[in-house]
């Protein structure tokens, strides 16, 4: 039966979005000291290769931070540690003052309020934009609830609010598979926003986008900062310059430099690492 494939797809996605499981209760986030993420002396090795080398990084509450660095600098491994995909050999990782990320599973970390957007968008192409957001909604709405229960007015308002924020209100009834690459990226960001994360990790959001989509993505990410913290890993330096107040440069698993884009560009050590590549 044709209906079975979409249902199976929804169930599989429900396993990915474990945060919709109402049996999980998120620990309370404490950012009273103004910092949402603490990474201290994090080291990770894979078969003798040190992907992270005593990495220390702090992200402020409401901050938009850009992370740059050459291939192999440790950017992906850093995000893997934050989201629980990789356990470090040494170091500590705290979400706010009290939530020890190294003691939590991946689903528990998502439930605590950390959302991650990978480079390639993952959406339900056979379902509408509205349905994609509905499935991702935080709270007691698993797959079967979505299939057989009606949304409340408050839930519809929440979806409409996110649709407006990501600029897809006019495509709410369109199949996700019909969207452009950039629109799919915005939809997946919207799906994460339905879970109301306090910290959003975004990996190369403008790769493959048109100039117009890139500009719109910059506007979207800037609009998200303040209410939540946003960490963007990106290779497009023009895009980084358009959104970043603070840039962190990673090299060989450690922080090489940190500051404004101008400060980073004029840093002698950074210029040596990039060997003349344009920043």
Residue ranges of predicted features:
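ABC ATPase NBD Q-loop/coupling interface
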Residues: 92-111
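ABC-family P-loop ATPase nucleotide-binding domain
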Residues: 1-43, 278-279
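Helix-to-loop junction immediately C-terminal to a conserved catalytic motif
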Residues: 83
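Conserved ABC ATPase "signature" region
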Residues: 21, 27, 146-171, 198, ...
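Helical segment within the ABC ATPase nucleotide-binding domain
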Residues: 214-226
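The feature captures the beta-strand-to-loop junction immediately N-terminal to the Walker
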Residues: 68-70
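Catalytic Walker B motif of ABC-type/P-loop ATPase nucleotide-binding domains
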Residues: 200-204
